[in-house]
Amino acid sequence: YKYAEVNDVIQKFNNIVIGEISNFTEKKSVTHFEYKKGNKKNFVEDQRNILSIAEKIRRNFKRVFIFSIGGSNLGPSLMNDIFNKNDLEIIFITGSDPDEYSSIQIQEDDALVISSKSFGTLETLSSYKEVCGNNFYHNSFAITANKSKALDFGIHEENIISFDSSTGGRFSIWSPINLVLCLLEGEKGYKDFLQGGKEMDDACLKIPEDNPAFQLSVQDIIYNNLLNVETTLVMNYDYKLRNFISFSQQVEMESNGKSIDSNNNKVDYQTGSIIWGGYGPESQHSFFQHVFQGTKQSNKYFICSRSDKLNY
């Protein structure tokens, strides 16, 4: 707990949550917390808009194609894994390789969602054009922080979902980028998710003795800097979380993948570790011999569901 006191960790996190400048390069605050708080007008309006459009899509379309990559894809795709009970077919297209989408035939009852913060992501926009051409703008929706570019592209204004430009891509699951959750769980599920996120934020502001997130974070720092263990293994034993590793890699490695501090000074310590892992039952039959009998050490997290559902 001395580490927290000396480095003022809890207060620094609180400063980020309340909206103080944390991106010193662009002189911006971090705003994804505002969607969880739900007490600022423009953020509440964004949420009303996403719920309204989600209802419109559920009522009028049979399939949903989401053109997205990176932070606009990883979180929503994880939500689809967790919450989709096969009532709505949702197909993600990253646009990274034509083989991903070359066989797709768009129908009139398909909803087409372009999800891009900048609305300038090459893979996202080019794959939409390849798949849809210029024939389906009436079925198309945009989720973006750059409304003018979406309008110029041809998306109808009433089909554009805006969100704040200071919401980082790796945290955009808390923003309207998370249309998927609204489609699958409706208003109550969406609000419950945000409330859960806020409760975790509040827990992270508690004193170190009552703060599990802080304690685990210090453990990671000790492994990485004192014990020279450079990788963190994340294993999931719940099928719905089988792709959680991809989401967690972005959240941690994009956030902490730095070699300079907030004042642009070169650091003399290790920052984030390398995150890897997978779905437990599959991984046990691929790389677990290395984990248990190999010469490399890793900081290990095992995530399980409360009920044992595994078929041994």
PLM ranges: what are they?
Residues 5, 28-39, 87, 188-191, ...:
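Acidic catalytic cores of enzymes that act on phosphate-bearing nucleotides/polynucleotides
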